[in-house]
Amino acid sequence: MRKALVRQRTSALKMFAAPTSGWIANQNLAISAPKSLQGAEVLENFFPTATGIEIRRGSSLYATLGGGDLPVTAIFDYNNGNNKRLFASTATTIYDITVVSSPMNYRLSTGSDEIITDGGDYIGQLSTGGLEVVEGLSGGDWIVTQFATTGGVYLVAVNGQDPMQLFDGDQWFAIDDGDIYMLLYDAETAPFVENETLTGGTSGATASIVHVEDSGTTGVLYITDVVGTFQNNEIISSTSGSATADGTPQPYYVGITGVDTSSLSYVWSYKNRLFFIEKESLNSWYLPADKIGGVATPFPMGGEFSEGGKLLIGTSWSLDTSGDGGLSEQCVFITDEGQVVAYQGISPDTAATWSRVGGYK
């Protein structure tokens, strides 16, 4: 008996329009309409573009923060002309990862045995060893904004647990209700160390050292919590350091009063003014225009949100048109209940130029 020949299976080519509208889960994709969106029910490892889709690119390890045992909580940058910095944080530390010599931590070994020096030290490298710029933190969920004033361009960071952090393009400073002063010194006999108490040998004045710029026998101390009056040419000393004061302390940064900066969980700028959200509340705060310090003014918003909750984020929102017929920049507040309130104007201090323009859900 002859067997029937098995015919080769064929398949027809079917063309589908590229899902330029991306992933769509709230429409029936089986129904075609003249103006229906060109989307996909499943879109994995692809990104939609205006003309088609492109495959998701891969990734490579750039840096390992600390020992690699804590997750990365935030990545943020500073960009001011040629001064470009990249920072990353864990729950305890902020690192400057602009330049990283090795993406991973490693130790030299011979087979299963690691090489150890006579002093008991391992031979190897930490990816971000020496790149710590802020340490001893309680939280790492940083919200950051870059803010320019007539005095400089700054990175302002809050996390609702630690004092506000300020990066001035060179150094980081913790900003609380205490002012920061700059004190020059010379004739150094022993180097100063941060977080120690500075004492004036003649005046008896004291202060906390928050940052040190050491140039050998001369340098600059940045101090806060000053009690008393330091004198020029007196011996100044701490547990570790000693030198001669070259002048008297000069104001460097003004602290923020009126609110504990450790309670601020969100920051943004609007009309050349910094706004903040107080964590677990419906309270917002703002600083004077063109300032990174000073007296913070409360802007309570409990009466604006009928469903209560807490403020989650705030932002500056620009519209194409306004009541004046031109571009409109609005200050927007959003709660965890999904309510949105928008304001327009110069400052909440001035009722004549500050008004509520909408509430949304």
Protein language model annotation of sequence segments:
Residues 127-160, 220, 253-257:
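Aromatic/His-enriched, Gly/Pro-containing loop or helix-boundary segments
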